[in-house]
């Protein structure tokens, strides 16, 4: 598949186009231009390194939304075996924006749950662009309860702009479904490992992200609102999204510094979409390390650790009026 370049990557795109042109010429010519191709390839690689070493939060947001970025089912295919998808919330419908099911990780049974976007227009519409409705969160809760019953560790993958704000979703109890998931996950008697693989949009992300450890891919984001939404509220213009992204502190490095996540998983040069298999290998190692950390831990110790982790979020200072 031909790589789609973002606006700020145009210098790289131009170099890559030149390299492709030279390769095409070399195939139909007796002239050896391999040295020139190699020189330009090295230049492109260095340019990518320099560009990605100085990304703004807004540029990171764009990478997190890249249309070729691996989604949950892509990682399921690479990291897990014997995946058997489970459907429906047993109350209303099957929401395709949340996928989940039984699988094996490293030969051990587990439960996998994650947001799922689509690749083409038809699939994007079917999966509601990765924005779950209440039935999606209730399906996730059902699978979590099932995992708890059989003592299976839970892996969740976050990639959503946010919970769907439609009238029907609100009528069916969107806020209740999200709130219940937060409550349930805080008390589950089994390990929960969460990875933000793309967008981590507000409560829609948090509803499957109350975990024993939360990791983020290097160029993923996690925030209470999208930069465009924040800009529209504070500046009355979505054009202020770059400033909003800076103010939100939505990058992995910022959140790690604040203690809101536990680990950052580095991505291949140019982002996960440039080397999905390489990204999967890095993620596999991180998931295995996290799971190993909780194996052998008693249920009481696991839940106590999770509770302490949740209570450590945020800081406040008490002051006396007039002091």
Curated annotation (Swiss-Prot):
Enzyme class: transferase
Similarity comment: family membership: Belongs to the AccA family.
Protein name: Acetyl-coenzyme A carboxylase carboxyl transferase subunit alpha
One GO MF term attached to the UniProt entry: acetyl-CoA carboxylase activity
One Gene Ontology term, aspect cellular component: acetyl-CoA carboxylase complex
Protein's organism: Burkholderia multivorans (strain ATCC 17616 / 249)
Role description: Component of the acetyl coenzyme A carboxylase (ACC) complex. First, biotin carboxylase catalyzes the carboxylation of biotin on its carrier protein (BCCP) and then the CO(2) group is transferred by the carboxyltransferase to acetyl-CoA to form malonyl-CoA.
Boundaries of every CoA carboxyltransferase C-terminal domain copy: 39-293
Pfam families: ACCA
Reactions catalysed according to its record: N(6)-carboxybiotinyl-L-lysyl-[protein] + acetyl-CoA = N(6)-biotinyl-L-lysyl-[protein] + malonyl-CoA
Pathway participation: Lipid metabolism; malonyl-CoA biosynthesis; malonyl-CoA from acetyl-CoA: step 1/1
Keyword Lipid biosynthesis appears in the UniProt entry: yes
This protein's UniProt keywords: ATP-binding, Cytoplasm, Fatty acid biosynthesis, Fatty acid metabolism, Lipid biosynthesis, Lipid metabolism, Nucleotide-binding, Transferase
Gene3D superfamilies: 2-enoyl-CoA Hydratase, Chain A, domain 1
Subcellular location: Cytoplasm
Claim: Lipid metabolism is one of the keywords in the record: yes
Entry EC number(s): 2.1.3.15
Gene Ontology annotations of biological process type: fatty acid biosynthetic process; malonyl-CoA biosynthetic process
Subunit note: Acetyl-CoA carboxylase is a heterohexamer composed of biotin carboxyl carrier protein (AccB), biotin carboxylase (AccC) and two subunits each of ACCase subunit alpha (AccA) and ACCase subunit beta (AccD).
PANTHER family the UniProt entry points to: ACETYL-COENZYME A CARBOXYLASE CARBOXYL TRANSFERASE SUBUNIT ALPHA (PTHR42853), ACETYL-COENZYME A CARBOXYLASE CARBOXYL TRANSFERASE SUBUNIT ALPHA, CHLOROPLASTIC (PTHR42853:SF3)
């Amino acid at each position: 598949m031909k790589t789609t370049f973002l606006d700020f990557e145009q210098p790289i795109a131009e170099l890559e186009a030149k390299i492709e042109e030279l390769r095409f010429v070399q195939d139909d010519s007796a002239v050896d231009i391999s040295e020139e191709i190699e020189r330009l390839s090295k230049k492109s690689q260095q340019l990518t390194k320099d560009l990605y070493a100085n990304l703004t939060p807004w540029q990171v947001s764009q990478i997190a939304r890249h249309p070729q970025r691996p989604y949950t089912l892509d990682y399921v295919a690479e990291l897990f075996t014997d995946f058997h998808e489970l459907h429906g919330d047993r109350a209303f419908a099957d929401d395709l924006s949340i996928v989940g099911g039984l699988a094996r990780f490293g030969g051990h049974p587990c439960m996998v749950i994650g947001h799922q976007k689509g690749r083409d227009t038809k699939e994007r519409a079917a999966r509601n662009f990765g924005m779950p409705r209440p039935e999606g969160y209730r399906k996730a809760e059902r699978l979590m309860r099932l995992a708890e019953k059989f003592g299976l560790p839970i892996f969740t993958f976050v990639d959503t702009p946010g919970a769907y704000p439609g009238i029907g979703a609100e009528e069916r109890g969107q806020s209740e479904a999200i709130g219940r998931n937060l409550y349930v996950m805080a008390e589950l008697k089994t390990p929960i490992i969460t990875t933000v693989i793309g967008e981590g949009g507000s409560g829609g992300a948090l509803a499957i992200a109350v975990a024993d450890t939360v990791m983020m891919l290097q160029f993923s984001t996690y925030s209470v609102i999208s930069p465009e939404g924040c800009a529209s509220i504070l500046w009355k213009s979505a054009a202020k999204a770059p400033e909003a992204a800076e103010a939100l502190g939505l990058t992995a490095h910022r959140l790690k510094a604040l203690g809101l996540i536990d680990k950052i998983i580095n991505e291949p040069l140019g982002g996960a979409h440039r080397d999905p298999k390489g990204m999967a290998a890095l993620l596999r190692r991180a998931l295995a390390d996290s799971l190993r950390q909780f194996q052998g831990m008693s249920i009481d110790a696991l839940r106590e650790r999770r509770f302490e982790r949740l209570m450590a979020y945020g800081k406040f200072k008490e002051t006396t009026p007039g002091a």
